[in-house]
Regions:
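Glycine-rich, basic loop-to-helix element that forms the pyrophosphate-binding segment
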Residues: 66-82
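Membrane-interface aromatic/basic loop that binds lipid-linked glycans or pyrophosphate carriers
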Residues: 113, 273-344
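Short beta-strand/loop segment that forms part of the nucleotide-sugar
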Residues: 32-41, 62-67, 92
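Short, well-formed alpha-helical segments that are part of the catalytic scaffolds
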Residues: 13-26
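Short aromatic/hydrophobic "clamp" motif used to bind/position activated sugar donors
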Residues: 87
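Cell-envelope/extracellular polymer assembly enzymes that use nucleotide-activated donors
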Residues: 3-5, 34, 188
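A conserved acidic beta->alpha catalytic loop
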Residues: 23, 39-48, 69-70
């Protein structure tokens, strides 16, 4: 049995796919890994490239061709077909750091944890800058119990798709079924399997290279505004999923998942309260969503009051949504004058 399945979701990436696959297909690990290249209805030469790699590396590369269903659909296929003990997603325009990846696979052969967490790096190719992200207070090689760990050690950072490798049986046991034809589904991947993760190991290895080829590529607010219906669909799914399972979670898992959801909800409120230029729509949408959240999960609703701008908007029925190019700090100053007190 292979120790690791690496899923490579593939959609119109003929320019980058070879770099991605070449970083994985190293002589030292060929017999230990499975590479699932799942083509999601590409219109360019991506499928032909992946087929050629399958022919060249028949014991390692498995090519799957399917109709377009979005990023989530490729993960669904990958989890179903994976033969490796562990499972990792590597987007086809990203790559791995060769030296640390070899060490990573070597360590995995002896690993028993439900999940393995590593570091990653954002490569801003458009300006040549590189950002390194690590979990500074976790110990290299140490196994932690998620139900017992002091979550303060994470400093508010959660485990992302780029940093996380799950045991395949844990993914399947969680019942994870990613939404299809929907953006931002990585949040499902970050949350749902955690319900079945009791132990995780941390490797201080610089594995994942997250490619940012354009200044506007990263998940900035303009993209969120443009795709806000996708974001709303995803967040409502997460809220309803969590509401259905929270009573069965340990206190630590509740706190950890709520930490992720608070971050995600913070982004969602920011889209409407600060960045959407269609102010009438933003006003109506955020009031409707806020009422939905209060009705669906009072605990999450109350938790958001720790954010000053959400609290002030609620107290004024969202009359302080950003208007006509004004900066948010000006809105906050006005809110403070009206309310007669300062935000904490």
């Amino acid at each position: 049995m292979k120790v690791l399945t690496v899923l490579v979701p593939t959609y119109n990436v003929e320019k980058y796919l070879r770099r991605c696959l070449d970083s994985l297909l190293l002589p030292e690990v060929l017999e230990e890994i499975e590479v699932l290249a799942v083509n999601d209805g590409s219109k360019d030469g991506s499928a032909d490239i992946a087929r050629a790699y399958e022919k060249k590396y028949p014991q390692t590369v498995v090519f799957v061709d399917k109709e377009n269903g979005g990023h989530g659909s490729t993960i669904n296929v990958g989890i179903e077909k994976a033969q490796g003990t562990y499972f990792k997603v590597l987007d086809s325009d990203d790559w791995v750091n060769i030296g640390d990846f070899i060490e990573f696979v070597k360590r995995l052969k002896e690993e028993t944890a439900d999940a393995v967490i590593c570091d990653y790096r954002k490569e801003h190719v458009y300006n040549g800058k590189s950002e390194y992200f690590e979990y500074k207070d976790l110990e290299d090689g140490k196994k932690y119990n998620l139900n017992e760990i002091d979550l303060n050690i994470l400093h508010g950072e959660y485990f992302m798709m780029a940093t996380t490798t799950y045991r395949t049986e844990v993914l399947r046991a969680s019942g994870l079924k990613m939404l299809e034809k929907t953006f931002y589904v990585d949040m499902q991947y970050n949350i749902v399997p955690i319900t079945k993760v009791d132990t995780f190991a941390y490797y201080h290895l610089d594995i994942y290279r997250y490619f940012i080829g354009r200044k506007d590529q990263s998940m900035n607010m303009d993209n969120f505004v443009r795709n806000q219906e996708h974001n709303k669909r995803m967040i409502k799914w997460l809220i309803e999923y969590y509401t259905g399972i929270e009573k069965d979670l340990t206190p630590n898992k509740m706190e950890y998942i709520e930490m992720i959801l608070t971050y995600t909800l913070n982004t969602h409120y920011s889209i409407y309260c600060e960045y959407d230029k269609d102010h009438k729509r933003a006003y109506n949408e955020i009031r409707e969503f806020d009422a939905y959240l209060k009705k669906t999960n009072q605990r999450l609703y109350d938790r958001l009051n720790c954010m000053a701008y959400v609290r002030y908007n609620r107290e004024t029925q969202f009359k302080f949504v950003k208007v006509d190019g004004s900066k948010w700090h000006k809105v906050m100053v006005l809110a403070r004058k009206v309310k007669g007190r300062f935000a904490r």
